[in-house]
């Protein structure tokens, strides 16, 4: 049975639903996946960024793997879920054909939500163990930043909402590579800038 997808995140360029919205022509919902709804142009750009990340992290130690891109299906369940997108919902419902989905693994909740959950935890041995496991896993973020650095990658949107944590698997991952750039491009733009603090 299909489930109405819920908005689990929203930013400037996209709206994220879990479970995934339906791809065009699909009759089956990806229950264990999430979808990022965005303009086809932005989705195409972001897919190119994933090629760079995948080359740097072939074993997918620091991100969830390359998503798949598909056109958005115009069905009532999608439309109902999209109407809950605050930033882009109305625009999508008018210009449906201009939007696509990136379908990806669900990496858990972002660190902002996780920290709010933790605030409500009781002071128990079990919860202390959970936090210890989280902090042991947090080294993955530092290792991932080193991989980015070694490969000349700048994420450009590093914040708690762009790191997700799957508590059941005790796994942290970077997400949202839409603003990613290369160190070479950033250095070139700084050199060509007339802003006195650029370099």
Predicted segments, located by residue:
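ATP-binding glycine-rich loop module of kinase domains
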Residues: 10-83, 90
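C-lobe/activation-segment region of protein kinase-like
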Residues: 170-199
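Conserved N-terminal boundary motif of the eukaryotic protein kinase catalytic domain
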Residues: 1-7
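Conserved hydrophobic alpha-helix
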Residues: 141-148
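Catalytic-loop of the protein kinase fold
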Residues: 148-166
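Conserved structural core of kinase catalytic domains
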Residues: 60-133, 186
């Amino acid at each position: 049975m299909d489930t109405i997808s819920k908005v689990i995140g929203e930013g400037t360029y996209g709206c994220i639903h879990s479970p995934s919205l339906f791809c065009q022509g699909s009759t089956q919902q990806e229950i264990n996946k999430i979808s990022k709804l965005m303009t086809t142009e932005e989705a195409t750009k972001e897919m190119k960024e994933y090629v760079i990340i995948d080359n740097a992290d072939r074993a997918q130690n620091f991100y969830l793997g390359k998503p798949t891109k598909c056109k958005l299906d115009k069905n009532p369940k999608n439309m109902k879920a999209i109407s809950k997108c605050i930033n882009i919902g109305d625009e999508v419902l008018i210009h449906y054909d201009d939007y696509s989905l990136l379908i990806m693994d669900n990496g858990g909740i972002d660190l902002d939500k996780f920290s709010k959950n933790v605030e409500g935890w009781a002071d128990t041995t079990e919860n202390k163990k959970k936090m210890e496991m989280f902090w042991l896993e947090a080294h993955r973020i530092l290792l991932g930043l080193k991989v980015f650095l070694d490969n000349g990658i700048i994420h450009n949107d590093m914040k708690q909402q762009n790191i997700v944590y799957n508590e059941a698997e005790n796994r942290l991952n970077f997400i949202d590579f839409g603003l990613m750039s290369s160190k070479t491009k950033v250095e070139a733009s700084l050199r060509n800038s007339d802003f006195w603090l650029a370099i």
